[in-house]
UniProtKB/Swiss-Prot annotation:
It comes from Hyphantria cunea (Fall webworm moth). It is found in: Secreted. This is Hyphancin-3G. Residues 23-26 form a propeptide. Has antibacterial activity. Belongs to the cecropin family. The modification Leucine amide is found at residue 61. InterPro entries: Cecropin.
Length: 63
C-alpha cells in the first residue's frame, strides 16, 4: 500500500512537470501563420524571378 502511494505521488509529479513549459506560447498564433505564409510567398517570388526573366527573353526572341 505504501509503495502504491509513492508510485502515485511520483507519477503525479511527473505529469505536473511534463505539463509545465518553460516558454509560454504566444496567444496570437494567427499572426505567426500569416507571417509564415508571407515568407513563403516572398521566397517563391525570389526563386521564380530568374525563370520569369528567361521566359520574357525567349518571347522577345520569338517576336
Amino acid at each position: 500500500m505504501n509503495f502504491s502511494r509513492i508510485l502515485f505521488f511520483m507519477f503525479a509529479c511527473f505529469v505536473a512537470l511534463a505539463s509545465v513549459s518553460a516558454v509560454p506560447e504566444p496567444r496570437w498564433k494567427v499572426f505567426k501563420k500569416i507571417e509564415k505564409v508571407g515568407r513563403h510567398i516572398r521566397d517563391g517570388v525570389i526563386k521564380a524571378g530568374p525563370a520569369i526573366t528567361v521566359v520574357g527573353q525567349a518571347t522577345a526572341l520569338g517576336k
